[in-house]
Amino acid sequence: MKITPVKALTDNYIWMIQHGNHAVCVDPSEPSPVLEFLVRNRLMLAQTWVTHPHPDHEGGAAALWRGYMESPVYGESDIEAATHTVTAGTQFTFGDGQVTVWATPGHTDRHTSYLLETSDGIHVFCGDTLFSAGCGRVFTGTIEQLYDSFQRFNRLPENTLFYPAHEYTAANLDFAAHIEPDNADIQTALKAAAHTPTLPVTLAHERRVNPFLRVDLPHVRDRAEALSGKTLNSSLDTFVALRELKNQYRTK
């Protein structure tokens, strides 16, 4: 199985998953990059997966379905183009992989992640929940939901690969360095992010550089307290403070 990012809009990635001469597209913000990829690689669209109902994630799903009516569109009931409604725990297959739907709200009150389990491990298509070195903004969800989604991700095996839908890594690492200026892993990742695409990322990597997965560490909590001016009594408090600080932060 081969997984390829296809650039779309300004900073979106539409993830294309190939097995034989069939493909899945994840979060098609627009149809043309997907169609071009399919034609160039002589592939048939087998499935479309949508994580949440924002135009830059579902905008191309209806047009793709009209072109490939035999290919299902998976998404929750608020995804207008969905032909196959999913909920937490829904399972289906693609190629030799098993797909399990997780509810990972926070960015939106209903947000789906798709866990694809293959012989080489777990691949998580996480939309706007987790970004490399960061997390999604809270729109219609709650910060508590987002924290719970991160806690759940953090229980996966460390070699799990995450496939966010945006390339925000450099800006997120800049903020991470603001929180942990002495973290050598963040400095190394910053240098790498300046020269090459950064996705996908392993959970092991994110545990080293993503402040939102490091809220249990005393020095991260202390730094968040110092910058926010608030007393933080729990990991959730630290997560909330970091998200508020990130909202206000301007990349250098």
Swiss-Prot record:
SS bonds (residue pairs): none
GO biological processes: methylglyoxal catabolic process to D-lactate via S-lactoyl-glutathione
Enzyme category, top tier: hydrolase
Cofactor: how and how many bound: Binds 2 Zn(2+) ions per subunit.
Pathway per the UniProt entry: Secondary metabolite metabolism; methylglyoxal degradation; (R)-lactate from methylglyoxal: step 2/2
Pfam families membership: HAGH_C, Lactamase_B
Binding annotation for Zn(2+) 2: 56-57, 128, 166
Keywords on record: Hydrolase, Metal-binding, Zinc
InterPro entries with a match to the protein in the record: Clx_II_MBL, Glyoxalase_II_hydrolase, HAGH_C, Hydroxyacylglutathione_Hdrlase, Metallo-B-lactamas, RibonucZ/Hydroxyglut_hydro
UniProt EC number: 3.1.2.6
Catalysis: reaction(s): an S-(2-hydroxyacyl)glutathione + H2O = a 2-hydroxy carboxylate + glutathione + H(+)
Record-listed Zn(2+) 1 binding positions: 52, 54, 107, 128
NCBIfam families: GSH_gloB
Function: Thiolesterase that catalyzes the hydrolysis of S-D-lactoyl-glutathione to form glutathione and D-lactic acid.
Complexes and interactors: Monomer.
HAMAP family the record matches: Glyoxalase_2
Family affiliation: Belongs to the metallo-beta-lactamase superfamily. Glyoxalase II family.
Annotated protein name in UniProt: Hydroxyacylglutathione hydrolase
Organism: Neisseria meningitidis serogroup C / serotype 2a (strain ATCC 700532 / DSM 15464 / FAM18)
Organismal lineage: Bacteria, Pseudomonadati, Pseudomonadota, Betaproteobacteria, Neisseriales
